[in-house]
Regions:
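Alpha-helical metal-binding/catalytic segments enriched in His/Glu/Asp
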Residues: 72-76
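Extended beta-strand/beta-hairpin segments
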Residues: 1-70, 82-162
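Conserved phosphate/anionic-ligand binding catalytic regions in large, soluble enzymes, centered on
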Residues: 79
């Protein structure tokens, strides 16, 4: 750890997305900037998203809401593992299940009073570890994705008409 170079801890992650049809999209993750340099994945990660048929998709892939829950679960489990290791805490297993509630009245434009996205997310974690319950709570709260979802952050949208 070089505390004299705080910029080494600043990262920028990138993804590009192409809409294909109806609820079907293809997202590519090619690289990121961090630790003072650019990184490229040896092969871009290609992620497909779709909506279930009841939401006018074809049900060929997880939907965007599923990916939000997936990102949260993966980040929380990884954060527990990394921070436990840094503190010398043994973790044998982490299992996470999540539920997110959405009222589509907002998304469908049927109500301006209902949010368009998740109204709440419940995370249940089973962690086999020698840590105390208080330590496990602290470890789970280190997740950057959980922090992002808990805070209201600006999302800047740039639109280029073609």
């Amino acid at each position: 750890r070089d505390r004299g170079k705080p910029d080494l801890a600043k990262f920028t992650f990138r993804a590009s997305n192409k809409w294909l049809t109806c609820g079907n999209n293809q997202t590519s993750v090619k690289g990121f900037y961090g630790a003072g340099q650019e990184f490229s994945h040896p092969k871009p990660f290609e992620l497909e998203a779709d909506e279930p048929e009841v939401l006018l998709g074809e049900g060929k892939a997880p939907g965007p809401a599923d990916y939000v829950l997936t990102a949260l679960a993966a980040c929380m489990a990884t954060s527990v593992s990394y921070h436990a290791a840094a503190k010398g805490i043994n973790v044998e297993s982490v299992e996470t299940s999540l539920e997110g509630d959405i009222d589509l009245h907002g998304f469908l434009g049927l109500s301006t009073e209902v949010p368009k996205g998740f109204q709440n997310i419940t995370v249940s974690m089973k962690i086999k570890s020698d840590a105390t319950a208080e330590q496990l709570e602290e470890l789970a709260n280190m997740s950057p994705v959980a922090d992002t979802l808990k805070r209201a952050i600006p999302v800047k949208v740039n639109i280029e008409k073609q």
